């Protein structure tokens, strides 16, 4: 399918790919979509345009793989990984020295902010919407 077709129905495209390949699919972008072959869908509320940078996807795949290695099921690991990755990117982009210049983010900025993203989640620093969406994650 073309980029235009996928972007016109991101949820449908992610679900179709998940069902076709029998795998959890992460469709990165503004409000990344995670879909499972059984029809579960999560739309991620975290992240920013500065994260469209070389190496950011490598950081994300490492996070998801690490969560799976700790025993989380693939869908939960993808949801938690994408959420924390986006939260780390948001924290990195909001540093005072960047003065809102998200375009200057590099993958190591995201990597460096993962512990802070995890700490903020563990401290309950989430909005009501994020709390509701995170209920699909069984544990961290």
What residue ranges belong to the model's regions?
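Short, small-residue alpha-helix embedded
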Residues: 53-84
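Glycine-rich phosphate/dinucleotide-binding loop and adjoining beta-alpha-beta core of small-molecule
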Residues: 1-45, 119-140
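Gly/Ser/Thr-rich beta-alpha loop segments that engage phosphate groups in nucleotides
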Residues: 31, 49, 56-60, 64, ...
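Short, well-structured alpha-helical segments that form the helix of a local strand-helix-strand
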Residues: 10-19, 74-88, 107-115, 129-133
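Short, charged, surface-exposed loops that flank catalytic or proteolytic processing sites
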Residues: 2-10, 71-76, 97-105
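Short pre-catalytic strand/loop immediately N-terminal to key active-site residues, enriched for Gly-Thr
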Residues: 41-55
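Charged C-terminal helix
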Residues: 89-140
């Amino acid at each position: 399918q073309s980029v235009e077709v996928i972007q016109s129905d991101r949820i449908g495209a992610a679900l179709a790919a998940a069902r076709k390949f029998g795998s959890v699919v992460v469709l990165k972008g503004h409000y990344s979509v995670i879909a499972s072959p059984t029809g579960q869908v999560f739309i991620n509320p975290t992240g920013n345009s500065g994260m469209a940078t070389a190496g950011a996807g490598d950081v994300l795949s490492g996070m998801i793989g690490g969560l799976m290695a700790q025993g989380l099921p693939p869908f939960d690991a993808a949801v938690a990984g994408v959420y924390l990755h986006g939260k780390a990117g948001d924290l990195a982009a909001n540093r005072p020295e960047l003065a809102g210049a998200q375009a200057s983010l590099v993958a190591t900025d995201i990597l460096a902010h993962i512990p802070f993203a995890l700490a903020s989640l563990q401290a309950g620093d989430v909005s009501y919407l994020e709390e509701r969406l995170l209920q699909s994650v069984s544990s961290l």
